[in-house]
Amino acid sequence: AQIGRTEALNEAVEANGWNLLAQQTGEFTQAKGQEVMESMLKQYDNINVVYCENDNEAFGAIDAIEAAGKTVGSDIANGEIMVISFDTTHAGLQDVLDGKIECDVECNPLHGPRAEELIKKLEAGEDIDKLNYVDEEIFAHDDTVKSVKATNSLDEEKDFDVTPLTQDILDKRAY
């Protein structure tokens, strides 16, 4: 997943002409995410967006941003720093509701049960589709962005809906 997330960022930077100030791994931990963000804040005074490859890194980045007296949020024109993350842990989605993470892209933990279901079908002699997917969602703090265009693992470009997160949606999630 990490390789795909990094490649997607690099492709978006190139396609949109964005200025990527720096790129460093947070090693998927809150502590390292905080350490990296503290370093970035000392090196750069014009950070607009922080792209974290999981929620733990985002939590650390948010801690560092707030400790530096800066504000996380979507109003980058007025100095806020937007945080984007992946995984959609319960705590990550709570940060989406609270406006600390602007967008959180799901990495569904239900792949295991889906694989088990497919194995049982095969063992029972049933046919299954060659390709099987577990639904995943993109959650945002508000409804500013309705969908995003991305290329899937089959190299097909498609639109993915962005769901504005509500407390009701968060409360009904199984994980």
Q: Where in the sequence are the language-model features?
A:
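Hinge/cleft segment of the Venus flytrap/periplasmic-binding protein
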Residues: E11-V13, C107, H111-Y175
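Short beta-strand elements in bilobed, periplasmic/extracellular small-molecule ligand-binding domains
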Residues: A12-Q30
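Local beta-strand N-terminus motif with an aromatic residue
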Residues: L20, N46-I47, I101
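Conserved beta-strand scaffold positions in the cores of enzyme catalytic domains, especially
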Residues: L20-Q23, V83, D104, I138
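Short beta-strand elements at the ligand-binding edges of bilobed clamshell
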Residues: Q23, D98-P109
